[in-house]
Amino acid sequence: MKILVPIDGSSYSDNSLEFVASRATLLGKNPEIELLVVLAPLPTRAARLVSKDSLMRYYEDEAEKIFKPARKFLKTKGVEVTEAFIVGDPAEKIAEEATKLPADLIIMGSRGRTALAGLFLGSVTD
């Protein structure tokens, strides 16, 4: 079974990690679990001010800030995962990655923003 777990460092994605960790053995024998971080692209004007290498390092550093605590938590639970990060629209990129894997299951939080921002901006899961 291939499971995609999009995370963003929010308490909602922490809940999805706890769900995966507590039920990993119920999700099939040796499930393949991929953690996915989707980062919003920097505005074009800002991105033009730095080199492509610097921009890629920035995205890698931002993704690592999200992966590191997730990786540490899942390791303590004995859950092995692969990791991927993509830059773009979260809903679009999650759907693309789910198709590419192909994922049998997507486990993700219902919100990733603060409640107030979610009220005005919506959510990827909406």
Q: Residues of each region from the PLM?
A:
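Small/aliphatic-rich secondary-structure junction motif
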Residues: 1-52
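Active-site-adjacent beta-strand anchor residues
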Residues: 6, 84, 109
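Phosphate- and divalent-cation-binding pockets in alpha/beta enzyme and binding domains
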Residues: 15, 93, 115
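Class I S-adenosyl-L-methionine
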Residues: 21, 64, 68-75
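A short acidic, glycine-rich active-site loop
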Residues: 53-65
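Structural beta-alpha unit
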Residues: 72-106
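Gly/Ser-rich helix-loop-strand patches that form or flank binding pockets
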Residues: 96-126
